[in-house]
Amino acid sequence: MINEQYDILTEEIRADNQVPPYTPDDVIIDSITKCERRLNMLKPGTDFVTDPLSRGLLKDFVYYDMVHRFEEFLANYGPDIRAWQLSEEVADASE
């Protein structure tokens, strides 16, 4: 994502999760990048800008991370993450 997209996502996270205004944007952006990297490891090539499901998972993941429950997110959202990983049709490798 580019900086402008991080700024938009930061504001969405502030509004959705009632993040206090005194929380620096850098803290939220650091959490976004950490969670974005982890989700990209689980499903490479994910587009968090245009895919609403991916964006929603990222925002929820950031919330869990900001309250220091990073691994708890993975446990609670495990079935959703697996469904998300399998939601994209894979091209036949034999072609």
Where are these regions (language model features)?
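Conserved short "hinge" loops at termini or chain/domain junctions
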Residues: 1-54, 72, 86-95
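Short, hydrophobic/amphipathic alpha-helical patches that form generic packing surfaces
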Residues: 56-68
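Short acidic/histidine-centered micro-motifs embedded in hydrophobic/aromatic stretches
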Residues: 31-34, 61, 80
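C-terminal structural segments of small proteins and small subunits
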Residues: 66-86
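Intrinsically disordered, low-complexity N-terminal regions enriched in serine/proline/glycine
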Residues: 21, 60-63, 76
